[in-house]
Amino acid sequence: LIANKSHTVVLSKEWKQVLESCIGPVHVMNNPVDAKIQPSSVERDRLHLLLLGRNDPVKGHNFGIQVSKKVREVHPQLQVSMTGISTSPHPWLSAKGWIEESEKLHLLQTATLLLVPSAFEGQPLVVLEALTCGLQVIASDRIKSLPEGTIRAPYEDVDAWVSSICQYLKSPIDFNFHTDEFRIAHISEQWGIFYSKCVNLEAQ
């Protein structure tokens, strides 16, 4: 707050549309992606699903396991890695608990597809990190602020998710993700411009 005037920043155009009619002008600022997040020359696994997130019902681990079991009926060699959970009921499911950033990066660089079945997310940084690494994402249609090219599937619709995943595993979809607007240097520059505008506005 400056001189009793608020300067509101949100992470997506969707939240801007929701809030502006209630509180006035809102500025959109993207989450930044760490410069260490880069694609790798290592060949990706052919049948490897990945779910990254804390162990919370909103993140959809149980749903992800249900979907993976069904996908394995078509692709028996499928392997699945999940963070957040520390025990696994299946030999094909690697429950990794909490992991270091270096291991997360390795998973993003080698997995086949990232699952984001969450009930809710703001602007999920893990999606931006995955796309920056060249890893395609399938996400719940409840998540509104997703980059163009992300595969969407209906929330908690097992059959729809299985169909979309199997289709991708059969015929991977190429996508172009413009990473520059999510780089830290660019976001820092945008914050500088925003602060300058706020100060200049108050000086008028």
Identify the meaning behind each predicted range.
Residues L1-Q38:
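Donor nucleotide-sugar binding/catalytic pocket of nucleotide-sugar-dependent glycosyltransferases
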Residues V33, S41-K59, I65-S68:
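Conserved donor-binding/catalytic core segment of Leloir-type glycosyltransferases
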Residues H106-A111:
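Short alpha-helical donor nucleotide-sugar binding micro-motif in glycosyltransferases
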Residues L114-L115:
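A short hydrophobic beta-strand element within the catalytic core of glycosyltransferases
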Residues A119:
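Aromatic "clamp/platform" in nucleotide-sugar-dependent glycosyltransferases that forms part
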Residues V127, Q136-A139:
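Short hydrophobic beta-strand element within catalytic cores of glycosyltransferases
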Residues K170-A203:
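A charged, aromatic-enriched C-terminal amphipathic alpha-helix characteristic of glycosyltransferases
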